[in-house]
Amino acid sequence: MGKVNTSGAGAAQRIVITPGGPRPAENVHLIEPGYHVSGKNGVLRKIHTASDQVIREFGPVNADKTRSRKTLRSQRQAVAPGPITDQWIVYGGWINNSGNPINYFGTQWQIPPPPASMDNQLLYLFNGMEDAGYTVILQPVLQWGASPIGGGNYWAIANWYVGSPDSGLALHSPLVPVNPGDLITGVMTLTGQSNGAFSYLSSFAGYNADLPVKDIGELIWAVQTLECTGSSNFRIIRQHQ
């Protein structure tokens, strides 16, 4: 975590590290059980599912400067979607160009032992799906370390819907502690589609940490990722890739 000076009043803005990279802490929001995220008409809202009441309007998933970065990318030759943050240590992905949406993407993990050394590292291990424009990722995440939503020297899980770094929103389910040796399955399921909008559920089977996201763009890039900050060991690995 760190601070950057904001223009104007000379205040400081706290920057936190999410599974989608760094961003202002004020852009990280909890979506509790019984609520869902709606992206209808390009605006993200927190909705009480039973009553369909709008609880909060967040605005676009990405702020202006992030959308500008996307525009710059679109001016280059078209390439495959890539990591939403440069903190991905290793990853592998698959682009869906079948003409049919991905309706299920699941990964089973056996939670590993604690890291051999403790150097305040923050680890995120996840399967995820991005849209075609680099702008958002939906992801069931296993974490080690202290993240902006909690944690410490133990493993825990949460589901995230995250925009691009620096200015994008990061919406998440509650964080749930888990134990080394446990088998967990992170799943993203297509729950509906209508008029070019798609709805998904990101979840861990058997855990109360679901994150429903409705009426967003299609997610076409499926990826498995290890993301890390704060560890010199992982920086060395990346230098030798």
Locations of the language-model features?
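Exposed, interaction-prone regions of secreted/extracellular proteins
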Residues: 1-241
